[in-house]
Amino acid sequence: MNNIILIGMPGSGKSTLGVVLAKKIGYKFIDSDLLIQEREGMTLERIIEKYGDKGFIQVENDVNLSINPEHTVIATGGSAVYGREAMEHFKDIGTVVYLELPPEELEVRLGSLRERGVVSNGKTTVEEIYADRVELYKKYADITINEEGNQLRDTVEKLYDIIINKDSYN
């Protein structure tokens, strides 16, 4: 299936970039965090408070497993990579793109981790959360886009060029 699945840390621009990219290539757009909130009837922050990190990861994995569109850009939550089954599903239904950004830039973009509804797995800083996840992002990525110092439009153009040059998207 010709979907594009965006993974990366909170604040890496998955949702913002996803909407712009979907418009540019004529695809639909899904934000999996919004699907999770809709299913649970509460914010991500509240879901984490209620179920803890492990419970949230299970909810996220279940919701992500249920996503099965065609010609869609899917922005995942930053913790989606903790759900092995869902990540394998995403690899089956599309191309997984890791939006890579160093912790220093992420910290500037993020603000409060708690208010953002970020699964921390006991980690307290952006650097610690990044270190906990970076190998999983690399493991599941078909394409890695380094966003360091780039504007949104630059990243969209770079990803667009990669996508239109892939045989499966022609």
Feature locations, PLM:
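Walker A/P-loop
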Residues: S15
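P-loop (Walker A) phosphate-binding loop of NTP-binding proteins
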Residues: M9
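ATP-binding Walker
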Residues: S12
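A glycine- and Lys/Arg-enriched "phosphate-lid" helix/loop adjacent to the NTP-binding pocket
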Residues: I93-E135
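ATP-dependent small-molecule kinase phosphotransfer cores
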Residues: L34-A80, R84-H89
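Post-Walker A helix-loop "phosphate-sensing" segment adjacent to the P-loop in P-loop NTPases
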Residues: K23-S32, M42
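NTP-dependent small-molecule kinase module
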Residues: V20, K24, V134-N170
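Hydrophobic anchor at the beta1->P-loop junction of P-loop NTPases
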Residues: L6
